[in-house]
Amino acid sequence: MKILVLSTGGTIGSATKDGVMSPDKNATALLVLLYESSFQDVAEFDCESVSDILSENVTEPFYEKLINRLLAVDTEKYDGVIVLHGTDTLAYTSSLAAMVCRSLPIPVGFVGANYPLKHPKSKAFVNFRAAVEYLKAGGRGFFVPYENSDGKTYIHLATRLTEADFLHDDFHSLGDAVLAEFKDGKIIFSNDSRLPSQEELSKPLSGITDGEFELSGRVVLLKSYPGLDYSELRIKHDNVCAVV
């Protein structure tokens, strides 16, 4: 099995020095080396850097670069892709990629961590291992593995993932419907009827773009709340093409 590992930065791609966390170009290589030294595995890894940014700072150019790299993956060469990504916007990126890159015939996982790899509380290694084991077990689709504060590691369908909660930094899926659980070194598929089956996930859908993917920054998202006075809102039509 050959896996392409794409690093984008984030906490999982960072290191802490003198109490300050910053991107570390060696983080991905260290994570893969730690995995390879811990398990006599059949998996081979190719590592590539797409970006080196904390995920709360991502913009449209970041998404365009990552999506276009995924669309260009040699699916004859690789059995799967693992994207290392920050947790702050993990739900946004994984869901967007799942929708735009739905024509890919190979599975794509998004792996993040709450602390840098060398921190004793980091979940980088277990989340990465869960992603590899999911691929080895024949798991399909766009997925996100994450170990929560209760010690349980779930494999989420990317399009059902919610943002991490503010109390424990745990990740959940809508309705708690997950693809699988990673337990005792093994993947246990849930076969939840509320989610697409592994067979359905293995069938690529028609692509939504024929050329380079471009993400418009001219869409405004309004989050309503009780008492919001819409009459006070002023939107310059020249700069906006849609309002959600």
What are these model-predicted stretches?
Residues 1-242:
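Active-site histidine-anchored catalytic micro-motif
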